Amino acid sequence: MSNMSKGNLKTDKNTDYLFRYFMNEDKLNEQLRTELDREMDEKIKANKNFRLDTRIGTERNKSVTKKPNINGGNVNNANGANNNSSEETELPSNSENSDKPNVDFNDSDSDSSNQDSVTASDGFNGSKSPYKNKINAVPGSILPVNTFGQFPGLNQNFQQDSGQNFNQSPVARNTYTAPQPALGDRLIGDIEKYIETPEEKRARAREAYAKLEELVENYSVQLSRTYTIDDDPNELEAEYQMQKDKRSKKTQVQFYKQILLNIVCGAEYLNETYDPFKIKLKDWSKQMASDMDNYTEVLGEIYEKYRDRGGKMAPEIKLLFMIIMSGVTFHLSQKLFGQGGLSDVVGNNPNVINQLLGGLMKGGMGNMLGGDEPVEAKVTPKNNKSILEAIKKYNNKGTSESKSESRSDYKSESVNSVSTEKSDKQSETIKKITEANEIVAKERERRLMAEQRAEMEAQLRRQSEQHAAEMEQMRNQYLNSIGQLSTTRPVDNYSQPSINDNYVNTPTKINNSVNLVLSDATKKPRFLNNQKVANSPIISNKPLNTRDIGFGDFFGNETDMNKESSKKSGRLNIGGFDNLDSLDSTNSIDSEDDDIVSDINDFFASNKPTKSPKQPVSATKSTTKKRPNSITRSATRSVGRKKGTETSDLITPRKPKIIDL
């Protein structure tokens, strides 16, 4: 501690930097820790009979030194009072009897002994240990600045480097700041404000919906979607705010345009009246009026930039600006068009508006309404002064000005006549063009209908041809099946053994040898030796007489059945084959085929041929009629009706000998 009192405090550069600029209390305690621990160890070694639960007490009359007065005897205490007298500080290292034990172990836990012991161990003026100050610190309090007075060297370094006296600090000492309430505690009182009842929510929805309806009805605003009163009030309010901002921007931009145009008109008028700088600004306002749409984006950006700067404009100020702008506009009209104003000029001379509009159109919009420059624009005077003079002359009803008025009236009448003639010609040409367009439209419609009709006819023709081909195919299949059934003959393939004979029923097939069929090409085929095969109508080229085998009765019955069915359906069926519509149904064909097969099987079972193979099949040729020709003819007749000119190819009778097996 003697080194500390002399100002020989050993600190590194970084620690000095922290002390100098930040007064870091933790760094200071860390720097003093080793010195304080060393002194504490020396005191414990000097006392042999010590107890750990006692406090260290010292006698104030021993090892008392005077604290040096660095600041001229004016040192601040911890309480902020000035002490001119030297204060006695107990330093164990500077005591006279430092070798003897100079501490007493006191069991009392009084505040005075505690304060004395801490003062002796720390070396601070009446303050506790820096460790205890750190632990028992009151919120908001700081380390007393006058503690640096105990270290003259350190205090001098601070004062020399920074030029400030840290013993006189303006910071309040031992201040206490009350803790702030938590966020939840503050919200508990206003919790009802954050809870919205269903009635309040519906009320907000009704209010926002009413505002939206007012915007739509008064200003024809187009909403982003269709809203109802049952929608979310937050969405309704957001939509209303968006539409309101859009409309506010639009109206404000229009107001800016009006202000800009009035400024330009005023500048042009002043330049024409005084002309101090010889600047040619004639018809500048007309050019600005024609190009005003080009300034919409820039004026919108200006509005977006400054709309939140000055806050929302009061409605009174806005109304005042509107009245001022109206007055300025009226003043300009009175100045330009005389005492009567624009209404009197228009009433007395209607062509003034046409002339002004012609001048505007000539500036930048002349080619938008027809391409050619209007006649009124050609008659327009060259400058504004001539317009003012003409208007003043017209307003003055002097005798000398009557001639000029009559001339102007004559010119206006001539201009009106030319314009009426042009309008009549234009109306006639428009009428002719409309009539020609109507004729072209009718002709186009007629051609389109004709093309559609041709396409429909071609489609129907293709469908009819396809249907006829299907019917022809079905007819051929049906005739082939009938021919195959008619040419089938029962063959005695099985020999009937006697009842008494022990005969195994094994079939003895006739003509089952391959050699009987595949004979020599130069000789007559061997299967012709079989009498039954030789007498067949296919081999012998003899017509098949259906009456001999009972087919006539069968086809007669079929004809009667078809007639009865045709009477029920209202159609005529001839010969059992004319009703070709019945061939479209596969179920009817299958049922008829099953009936035919069953009848033929019954016939073969009842009428077995005799054993004499020489008997011809068509024995009763003279007593029967040729049915196949009539059957084929009747079948082709109905198909020929549908195919028209193709009937001649189908009328040829189909002979049984050419039926393909």
Swiss-Prot record:
Disordered, as annotated region: 55-132, 396-429, 558-577, 604-661
Ranges of Low complexity composition bias in the record: 69-84
Biased composition range(s): Basic and acidic residues: 400-412
Ranges annotated as biased composition (Polar residues): 118-130, 607-622
KW Transport (keyword) present: no
Entries under Pfam families matching the protein: DUF5767
UniProtKB keywords: Coiled coil
The keyword Phosphoprotein belongs to this UniProt entry's keyword annotation: no
Name of the protein described by the UniProt record: Uncharacterized protein R449
Domain of life: Viruses
Coiled-coil boundaries: 23-51, 198-226, 435-485
